[in-house]
């Protein structure tokens, strides 16, 4: 069953200030599409600023794949309003284009039409585009156009002071990092609850497969939509962004030094498969290198330990310097029922669940045990809503119904919710528990259940198009609430100045820059 955390919950009830001041951030990806849903072939709109240097509006893999990044925030309402303001501003500046509201792309005629994100003529800009060229040549461009939401989360220092007895972040970095690794291990064990409740990619357009082999038993509608009747998140399946060559890297989440050493090993380990791609063709680079990972960010993971990097610092060097500062949750599909791709209920649920993961005991896990947890994720991803579906506990030695495990978990989450609500004198967190608990008795009320019902009636392309148009009208007509037009114009202008400055300060050739990095 789930770990017994009654003692930890009693401790939390006695130390409510330990969870006052949680910091959060959201990153939301979305494809720019035309009125008929096809991938936009236009460049990143100049009015939105430089994708290289803008603090809030950038691009991910493709020139048409927008990414919105909120600043760190300790207020849920303000965080979501800021994100919505970015959406409002972008909606007003996309002309007749709109933002695709689903994780899975639909109307992409050919991978050749997917232009890689462009970041200007500086070495760092060209490096970023070449990294994407490598991703395209390794995994195919289509897979890289799948969109998601990332949720960044950190517990306040007061939590670690009360729980672990640390004095400050610097002297306590070992204990704090160990605490975040415990959270991560619990996330691997129980994080399947996220795609169960919020997975929103139960179907794909048949064009997405394009002759690719799949052993998945898809059902097909008359309109050509492919779906699995009980699937929750095909984005998280092997059809989505996974890297099979990474599964034997032996990366574990038991302590910082071992984790970083394994990560550094992966970026130095040559790959026979990627060596066959080659480094150059007709004088043009094809990837940054031929190692298993070109850079650390290529590591696929449903959750990542993070620290803000300094200039010239790799993510792992930042972790070694200061320990884990926050974690990045990467298992959220785009929420099609929200104009901004994520809702307040989801944010509040993640707060509760991540606090639970930090409180619950989590024995160290070997690489094999981590692979074992993947079985539960796969079961939920492909057949999560199947009546009587079970998850395996203790590496598959015990099977328990999802509904039973989910309800036990929510009994704990409600106690965490009461602590958080007492601080705000509003029952927001408890309301989220009530709202989501229903999904364990009636899986059709989950995001994937609701969405698949809609898609079977109208087709997934039609659902995407009508939601995109509805949200375009809604967002472009709403006034800004926390940002101003002046702030947005200044951020855009400053980002272009910064890009020009970076370009003018380059001193070495791109070949030399690559060799040095």
Swiss-Prot record:
Transmembrane segments: none
Protein name, as recorded: Glutamate--cysteine ligase
GO function terms (MF aspect): ATP binding; glutamate-cysteine ligase activity; metal ion binding
Pfam families: Glu_cys_ligase (PF04262)
Broadest EC class assigned to this enzyme: ligase
InterPro entries: Gln_synth/guanido_kin_cat_dom, Glu_cys_ligase, Glut_cys_ligase
Swiss-Prot/TrEMBL keywords: ATP-binding, Glutathione biosynthesis, Ligase, Nucleotide-binding
Pathway the protein contributes to: Sulfur metabolism; glutathione biosynthesis; glutathione from L-cysteine and L-glutamate: step 1/2
Disulfide bridge partners, by residue number: none
EC number(s) reported in the record: 6.3.2.2
Family assignment from sequence similarity: Belongs to the glutamate--cysteine ligase type 1 family. Type 1 subfamily.
Claim: Membrane is one of the keywords in the record: no
Organism: Pectobacterium carotovorum subsp. carotovorum (strain PC1)
Domain of life: Bacteria
Catalytic activity: L-cysteine + L-glutamate + ATP = gamma-L-glutamyl-L-cysteine + ADP + phosphate + H(+)
One cellular-component annotation, GO: cytosol
PANTHER family (UniProt xref): GLUTAMATE--CYSTEINE LIGASE
Encoding gene (name): gshA
Coiled coil in keyword set: no
């Amino acid at each position: 069953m789930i770990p017994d955390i009654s003692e930890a919950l009693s401790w939390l009830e006695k130390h409510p200030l330990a969870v006052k001041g949680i910091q959060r951030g959201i990153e939301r990806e979305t494809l720019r599409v035309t009125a008929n849903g096809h991938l936009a072939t236009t460049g990143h709109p100049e009015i939105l600023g430089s994708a290289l240097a803008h603090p809030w509006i950038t691009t991910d893999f493709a020139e048409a794949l927008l990414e919105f990044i909120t600043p760190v925030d300790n207020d849920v309402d303000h965080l979501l309003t800021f994100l919505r303001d970015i959406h409002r501003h972008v909606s007003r500046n996309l002309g007749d284009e709109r933002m695709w509201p689903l994780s899975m792309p639909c109307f992409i005629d050919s991978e050749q039409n997917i232009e890689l994100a462009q970041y200007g003529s500086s070495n760092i800009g060209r490096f970023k585009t070449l990294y994407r060229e490598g991703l395209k040549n390794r995994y195919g461009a289509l897979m890289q156009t799948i969109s998601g939401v990332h949720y960044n989360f950190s517990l306040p220092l007061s939590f670690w002071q009360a729980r672990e007895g640390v004095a400050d972040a610097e002297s306590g970095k070992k204990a704090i990092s160990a605490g975040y690794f415990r959270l991560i291990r619990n996330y691997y064990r129980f994080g399947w609850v996220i795609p169960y409740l919020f997975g929103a990619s139960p179907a794909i357009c048949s064009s997405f497969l394009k002759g690719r082999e799949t052993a998945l038993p898809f059902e097909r509608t008359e309109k050509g939509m492919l779906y699995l009747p009980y699937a929750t998140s095909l984005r998280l399946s092997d059809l989505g962004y996974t890297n099979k060559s990474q599964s034997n890297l032996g990366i574990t989440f038991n302590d910082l030094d071992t984790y970083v050493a394994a990560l550094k090993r992966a970026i130095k380990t040559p790959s026979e498969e990627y060596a066959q791609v080659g480094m150059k063709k007709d004088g043009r680079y094809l990837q940054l290198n031929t190692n298993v990972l070109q850079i650390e960010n290529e590591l696929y993971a449903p959750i990542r330990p993070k620290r803000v990097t300094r200039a010239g610092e790799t993510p792992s060097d930042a972790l070694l310097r200061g320990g884990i500062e926050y974690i990045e949750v990467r298992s959220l599909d785009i929420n099609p029922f929200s104009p901004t791709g994520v809702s307040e209920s989801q944010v509040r649920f993640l707060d509760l669940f991540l606090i639970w993961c930090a409180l619950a005991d989590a024995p160290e896990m070997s690489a094999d045990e981590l692979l074992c947890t993947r079985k539960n994720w796969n079961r939920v991803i492909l057949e999560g809503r199947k009546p009587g579906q079970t998850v395996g506990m203790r590496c598959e030695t015990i099977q328990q119904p999802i509904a039973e495990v989910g309800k036990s978990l929510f009994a704990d989450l409600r106690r965490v919710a009461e602590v958080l609500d007492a601080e705000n004198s509003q029952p927001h967190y408890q309301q989220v528990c009530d709202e989501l608990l229903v999904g364990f008795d009636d899986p059709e009320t989950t995001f994937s259940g609701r969405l698949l019902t809609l898609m079977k009636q109208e087709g997934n392309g039609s659902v995407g198009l009508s939601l995109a148009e509805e949200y375009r009208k809604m967002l472009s007509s709403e006034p800004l609430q926390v940002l101003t037009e002046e702030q947005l114009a200044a951020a855009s202008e400053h980002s272009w100045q910064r890009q020009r400055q970076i370009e003018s300060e380059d001193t070495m050739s791109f070949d030399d820059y690559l060799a040095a990095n």
